[in-house]
């Protein structure tokens, strides 16, 4: 990853935020991170846009990771969201993925964070390329139909 990833990080604990930033750096992820601590700041940052990735704690005062995912999906459906949680059970993992999380990482296993970020960014790039190719294919089909119509009209004269 050449240019720094623009990361929106929803985390209320400064110590956890520092550990997560260190894990990204140790994993070779260069980032420009905007850290917010509550729903209002999160919504304001989302509205400004320009982020490549969202990292979100699951449990925050008066706000949670699933609500954060819903806010992201409403405005930026293709923006990857990785939940980073201190505690996670199987039910949480399933619920978060069904809600639209790209991945989840335990705070006790932050060595998984950089690979999860790389995978999420690779999936975004693949999705963008697939959409580009689909648009190209549709355009080619339109041109083929126009060519057939033009040939039919020319034949009639």
What residue ranges belong to the model's regions?
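Conserved SAM-binding loop
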Residues: 9, 35, 83-85, 139
């Amino acid at each position: 990853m050449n240019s720094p990833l623009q990361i929106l990080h929803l985390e209320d604990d400064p110590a956890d935020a520092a550990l997560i930033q260190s894990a990204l750096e140790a994993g070779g992820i260069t980032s420009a991170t905007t850290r917010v601590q509550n729903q209002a700041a999160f919504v304001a940052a989302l509205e400004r846009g320009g982020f490549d990735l969202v990292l979100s704690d699951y449990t925050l005062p008066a706000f949670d990771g699933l609500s954060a995912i819903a806010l992201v999906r409403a405005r930026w459906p293709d923006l990857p969201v990785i939940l980073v949680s201190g505690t996670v059970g199987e039910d949480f993992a399933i619920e978060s993925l069904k809600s639209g999380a790209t991945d989840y990482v335990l705070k006790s296993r932050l060595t998984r964070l950089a690979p999860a970020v790389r995978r999420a960014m690779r999936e975004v790039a693949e999705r963008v390329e697939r959409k580009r190719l689909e648009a190209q294919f549709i355009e080619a089909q339109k041109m083929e139909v126009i060519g057939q119509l033009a040939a039919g009209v020319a034949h009639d004269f």
